[in-house]
């Protein structure tokens, strides 16, 4: 959707609020929200009018209330930088079965490492049986969870996440959860690059996933301070109160 649609909508409402993450089209709106970490207000200089309020960055990320509520408990847990639980979640239907590829990549980890794996799949996941087969061949305990309703709790209880560099990145940051991110769609690239540049996450190249993932995991075990640093930097990106911030801005229109 772009300006051509918004002009028509404006005839039937007082204010128009737009959520964008691409900055590649013009808008006719009173307020624009872009939650991307590396985005700047100037990216929209030629795309919105001068009177449009621009809310830019993950401090405005729209997270469910359980994430900011669980943030204090989660951050206290990060004082113990040992990896006991790895959380894997690609989101959506994972049509390309990246989850199975991640599990395959873990084969190159030191088999003597002591941790458990929790795999979260969406209700529309297409490759559950494949994931189960790969999971059963690993030397670690693997739990496969489908269509969960307690994602904040699962993140809080985990020590490292492996997942897509989409909107879930802000949930992980809110809880200070260190992450290895994968770019599964072009609009995730900016997020992944921003988090990696900040030191809040590591990006694993999807093309070399099976080759490189194990060495990354091994590195976290040999350098626990790296986890603490990543957690601290991730937690500084968003407090999870974006809903209130955005609501306040809308009420001021």
Regions from the PLM with identified roles:
Residues 239-253:
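C-terminal alpha-helical cap of glycosyltransferases
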Residues 152, 169-175, 193:
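Short alpha-helical segment that forms part of, or immediately flanks, the ligand-binding pocket
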Residues 156-167:
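Acidic donor-binding loop of glycosyltransferase active sites
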Residues 28-97, 124, 128-129:
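A nucleotide-sugar donor-handling region in carbohydrate enzymes
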Residues 219, 226-240:
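A short, well-ordered alpha-helix in the C-terminal region of glycosyltransferases
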Residues 72-74, 80-158:
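Donor-nucleotide binding loops and adjacent catalytic segments primarily
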Residues 161-163, 178-187:
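Short hydrophobic beta-strand element within catalytic cores of glycosyltransferases
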């Amino acid at each position: 959707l772009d300006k051509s649609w918004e002009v028509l909508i404006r005839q039937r409402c007082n204010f128009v609020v737009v959520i964008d993450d691409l900055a590649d089209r013009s808008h006719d709106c009173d307020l624009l929200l872009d939650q991307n970490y590396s985005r700047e207000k100037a990216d929209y200089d030629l795309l919105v009018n001068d009177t449009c309020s621009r809310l830019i960055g993950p401090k405005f990320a729209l997270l469910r209330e359980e994430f900011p509520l669980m943030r204090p408990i989660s951050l206290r847990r990060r004082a113990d930088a040992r990896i006991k639980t790895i959380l894997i979640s690609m989101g959506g239907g994972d049509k390309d079965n990246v989850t199975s590829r991640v599990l395959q990549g873990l084969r190159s980890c030191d088999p003597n490492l002591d941790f458990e794996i929790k795999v979260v799949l969406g209700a529309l996941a297409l490759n559950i049986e494949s994931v189960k087969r790969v999971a059963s061949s690993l030397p670690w305990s693997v739990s496969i969870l489908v269509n969960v309703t307690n994602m904040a709790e699962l993140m809080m209880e985990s020590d490292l996440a492996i997942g897509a560099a989409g909107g879930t990145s802000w949930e992980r940051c809110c809880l200070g959860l260190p992450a290895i991110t994968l770019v599964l769609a072009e609009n995730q690239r900016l997020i992944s690059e921003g988090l990696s540049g900040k030191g809040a996450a590591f990006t694993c190249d999807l093309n070399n996933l099976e080759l490189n993932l194990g060495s990354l995991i091994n590195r976290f075990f040999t350098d626990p301070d790296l986890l603490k640093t990543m957690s601290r930097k991730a937690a500084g990106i968003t407090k999870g109160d974006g809903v209130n911030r955005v609501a306040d801005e809308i009420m001021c229109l």
